[in-house]
Amino acid sequence: MIWPLPEPPVSERWRAWPVSQIFPETVPGVSPSGARVTYVLAGVAPEAPCRTAFQLAALRRGCRVALRATYADSTQTFVATVGIAVLDSPWSGSYRAGRLATVRPVAFPRGPAERFGERQYFTGVVVGSHENYMVATAAGYTDGRPYQPGDRVLPRLRDTARQLATALYRALTR
């Protein structure tokens, strides 16, 4: 009889889990109207130093490494980069949203995220509590439109950022 391997401690999952478990191919969500939404993985970036992966004001003391992936909604209207900061000790922050300092967007060629960059991110979310991870998102439009101060953020775009950050944080820390 083969016994199942024990689940790795939460603080080691970033290293022990396969990338497909940290960043699954699809993440389910719900639109503001209650319709089902699916976020589809556009690509996974290589591990990066925290200073490269996060905007300076988003950096947290004790950040060891950053993991990033970009998702698009199934209509290929919205795109969001999810960044996971692996920390030396639990983060005592809380949920924050808006156009705050966050993860640096990652574009992937020949797909819905090919025109996504720092000028294209409209909104983001930072999630974390009492674990060695902080999860941040930066969300924008797949058409590459740049953010202009005063631009209105659609509820669906805001939900994209929130749902991806929350779902991936919960999966990693459950």
Regions found by a protein language model. Name each.
Residues 108-174:
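Extracellularly exposed regions in secreted/surface proteins, prominently low-complexity, repeat-rich
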Residues 27, 43, 75, 82, ...:
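Solvent-exposed, flexible loop/coil residues
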Residues 48-49, 90-91, 155:
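Soluble non-cytosolic domains of exported or imported proteins
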Residues 40-44, 80-84, 150-151:
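Second-shell loop/turn segments in exported
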Residues 1-67, 169:
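Extracytoplasmic low-complexity, Pro/Thr/Ser/Ala/Gly-rich segments
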Residues 59-98, 104:
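Mid-length scaffold segments of soluble, non-membrane domains
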Residues 50, 54, 62, 92-99, ...:
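Stable alpha-helical elements in mature extracytoplasmic
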Residues 12-20, 88-122, 172:
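Ampipathic, surface-exposed secondary-structure segments
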